[in-house]
Amino acid sequence: MKNNISMKDFYEKYNNEELTILDVRENHEYAAGYIPSAQNFPLSSLGIEFTKLDKNQKYYVIYQAGGRSARAYDFLEAQGFDIINIEGGMNNWPGETK
């Protein structure tokens, strides 16, 4: 069972806590606008890049619309990471972007 968080709840946490956010969109999508503290880990290279992540850290995963972040979630969870999928993705992000 996936550990999901609504955009509303995520945004509230984002404004009150320091969260580690993985934006799994491709580089060109990320460059077009991203959550200021998000790290870019494109889904296409996640199978290699995941080794740079800390298994003792909780990660919030986001994509454009939420669908592909579920694939990243499944992969990272299978590797033993603590993952939370942000429902709705960047299409529903209410805050500012860089």
Regions inferred by a protein language model and the residue ranges of each:
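Rhodanese-like catalytic fold shared by cysteine-dependent sulfurtransferases
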Residues: 1-19, 27-58, 67-98
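Short, surface-exposed ligand- or partner-binding patches at beta-edge/loop junctions that are enriched
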Residues: 62
